Amino acid sequence: PSLNNGIWSKRTAILTSATIPLAMPTRVGLNEDDVDAIDVGSPFDYENSALLYCAKHLPLPSEPRRDDAVHDELEKLINAAQGRTLALFTTYRAMHAAADEMTRRLEYKIWRQDDLPKMALVGAVASEESACLFATAGFFQGVDVPGQTLSLVVIDKIPFPRPDDPLLSARRDEIGKTSFNEID
């Protein structure tokens, strides 16, 4: 309600993004009748150009051999993609451990998100076709490296927020039954 009664009651706003959901206006308190929205879809042919692979055979995160098994799987995947990998991790520890291990095992250039500022790093990866980029949450959205430079995206764990996060708990309590659809 505050956005509707505040800045957007005085000025027109045009929002564009690849990730803004059509339900966003009601989430921020705008009257749905006052909003024009359009979803233009994606130009990417997911059905013919993408493959989802879930390594269900890996040990659970709590099991002792998990890291070794993840590194073995990651090595196979990176070799299959001839480098050209964006590997995303939910912790810095996991990112650095995997990057150290892949640097030792593979001949491909392995960049880490803390090697350079974000845009310089994306440029460096884009300029070297077989390079790999290992990163954390800051790279889960908004990274675009056109062409064949990145052909594989690996995510070590789905980045669900901690269930005991106090801010998220308060938001869930406020929203009620539909909080999973609206927040999580």
Language model: regions and residue ranges:
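ASCE RecA-like P-loop NTPase motor cores
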Residues: P1-D184
